[in-house]
Amino acid sequence: MSPLSTGHVFISYSRRDTEAMLRIVSFLRGRGITAWVDNEKLVPGTPIWEREIEKAIDKASAVVVVLSPDAKESVWVLNELTLADEYKKRVFPVLVRGDFRESVHFRLVTRQFVDLRTNEERGLESLGAALSRYLDELKQIEEERLAAEREAERQKQAELARIAALKAGEERIAKSKLEAEQLAEEK
């Protein structure tokens, strides 16, 4: 993450949920949240596209997973969830189609999800608010981390300056002793 900014939000979805994914992405971008979507970022024919997806999840601040019966059956959605867990990313589940049992993967059953099935506008507002809060928290943590790094560097520089001053003082004392010895020998 660059200083004082948050990374993108990775969007995990089944191709059959592309329309719902596009509405979610449009809403998030309208709120100033950067969304990473594979069909926009991957160049067709890229031989290592799986690695590009992994890198995108690794660099993401969070993952939004679009839930539906098709998403639950998707090997790719499962792989992306696995990577999100592996990279310790906060996952925001969004239910767009189907009932809970047929749409929500067992790895997500204990997580609160956003339901877009009955009131999409209210659900999107809820998702946007939750993501904004979380991204603000990450930004605050990053600011605190950078401040701590700056303070540690300041303390390190102060210690180096103190050591240099002590060394210079010791050299002056040694030089004075030598000069005093030379004067004593001359007498």
Each language-model region and where it sits:
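Conserved N-terminal substructure of TIR/SEFIR domains
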Residues: M1-V66, D70, D85-K89, R122-E137, ...
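Short, hinge-like loop/turn segments at secondary-structure boundaries
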Residues: I53-A56, L108-Q112
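Conserved nucleotide-binding/hydrolysis micro-motifs of P-loop NTPases
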Residues: A71, R97-E102, E120
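A short, gly/pro- and small-residue-rich
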Residues: W76-R90
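Conserved beta-strand/loop subsegment of P-loop NTPase cores
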Residues: V91-L95
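Glycine-rich, charge-decorated loop segments at or immediately adjacent to ligand/cofactor-binding or catalytic sites
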Residues: D99-R111
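Short acidic-hydrophobic, aromatic-tinged amphipathic segments that line or gate anion-handling sites
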Residues: F113-N119
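Long, low-complexity, compositionally biased polyampholytic IDRs enriched for Lys/Glu and Gln/Arg
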Residues: K139-K187
